[in-house]
Amino acid sequence: MATTVTCTRFTDEYQLYEDIGKGAFSVVRRCVKLCTGHEYAAKIINTKKLSARDHQKLEREARICRLLKHSNIVRLHDSISEEGFHYLVFDLVTGGELFEDIVAREYYSEADASHCIQQILEAVLHCHQMGVVHRDLKPENLLLASKCKGAAVKLADFGLAIEVQGDQQAWFGFAGTPGYLSPEVLRKEAYGKPVDIWACGVILYILLVGYPPFWDEDQHKLYQQIKAGAYDFPSPEWDTVTPEAKNLINQMLTINPAKRITAHEALKHPWVCQRSTVASMMHRQETVECLKKFNARRKLKGAILTTMLATRNFSVGRQTTAPATMSTAASGTTMGLVEQAKSLLNKKADGVKPQTNSTKNSSAITSPKGSLPPAALEPQTTVIHNPVDGIKESSDSTNTTIEDEDAKARKQEIIKTTEQLIEAVNNGDFEAYAKICDPGLTSFEPEALGNLVEGMDFHRFYFENLLAKNSKPIHTTILNPHVHVIGEDAACIAYIRLTQYIDGQGRPRTSQSEETRVWHRPDGKWQNVHFHCSGAPVAPLQ
């Protein structure tokens, strides 16, 4: 009888050291190859937690990274599978993000921006020559090899990269990062290598003035701007940029991908290949200051996500008021959170001032040079980014990388099912509620005084004696729904829930709870197996 030999090559050949990054199913650690003493970054993926599709994506990423051997790309040196884990051994890049390095420089000019984009284009050209489209070019994926002056720019994170044949155009799914998405992707048309050039155009624009060409606090409006190619070169900051630099941006941000400049052509553009005579050598202090603010906002992604309203606002139950309206109390609470986020941002961004002549409400953050809107604040999610690791993390930001369609659809499914469950609660419909919940549902909630409750009887009491007898309108608003997909058939959602209702004296009230629900799909149908509720009781008892 044959015995299975477990591979231990990584364990035998490498010594692991400290963590340098984390992802959803992985950790990145510094490691040393024992026989040479050379340092690397080991991306360690827990394969026990991966679905079959996740395995395919891992294999695709490793296959693509093995193809790419270029001085401006983070190189994969080894790919090793052991029992329960897969190890990807990459270059150890220690210089941090390119954009962070720029703001620390004493001198920064158009010529420096030209040198940066040249290295990025060299990396993109190599990818395209090897039949690879990156699909997620953005500042977070542009690293420096070391902290030495003049260190090479390195393109990282090929988690969304795809393989194409020649100049093949096809629909490969909706993936990328909102502010850097091309018009053809937003129109859901066939696409290919030109999407990377569009993203290079966005990056070059930021490199020259410190803010993005497309931005809006409303993602739909942001997408409309991109599809229309609606950007400009406003005074006074663009007055000092050479016409050649603007010309290259225009050729990169050409709406028609067939007419868009290629990486090979862009490298031959005078502003790139003749920078010493064409690009301006003037120090761009205003660009550095704007870039500092741009970077500060990217780093404050987490603070914004926990305070900004998500776009999901829905009404359920016996509602007699206008749909999707908020009570003054609820509105005041959320506006306060937004103002706190703005205050924090402005302190971190060296006193950025919102534009005062804006006609938008006080919670909007305006002016591309001063206070950028939420859509422009982040590095541009996957709701998942770890600069070292390239694993995508989950968030609702405009600067986050968008996931592949299947993961996105699954998250929407979880949010919709959660809405249905809350609707059943507000309607006092225990039968509908029980269909969505596992019979062995466990929960921690204020009504149980901190005790773990198992089964449906505890909840049935509230349905039969309170909820089913309530004839007054109830309106629920979900804020910041945050879904973590756990394999193919499990997920967790966390959100803030505002419940508006009329109390016994006929006065409008609002209660807030913070909730987490764990969902499982045993037979193709999602069921709530556990939930944790903090804050005020879900059922308004007044």
Swiss-Prot record:
Induction: By cocaine in cardiomyocytes. One of its GO terms (biological process) is cell differentiation. SUPFAM superfamilies: NTF2-like, Protein kinase-like (PK-like). Changing K43R: Catalytically inactive form. Changing T287D: Constitutively active form. Residues 291-301 are annotated as: Calmodulin-binding. GO terms for cellular component: calcium- and calmodulin-dependent protein kinase complex; centrosome; cytoplasm; cytosol; dendrite; glutamatergic synapse; neuron projection; perikaryon. This is Calcium/calmodulin-dependent protein kinase type II subunit beta.
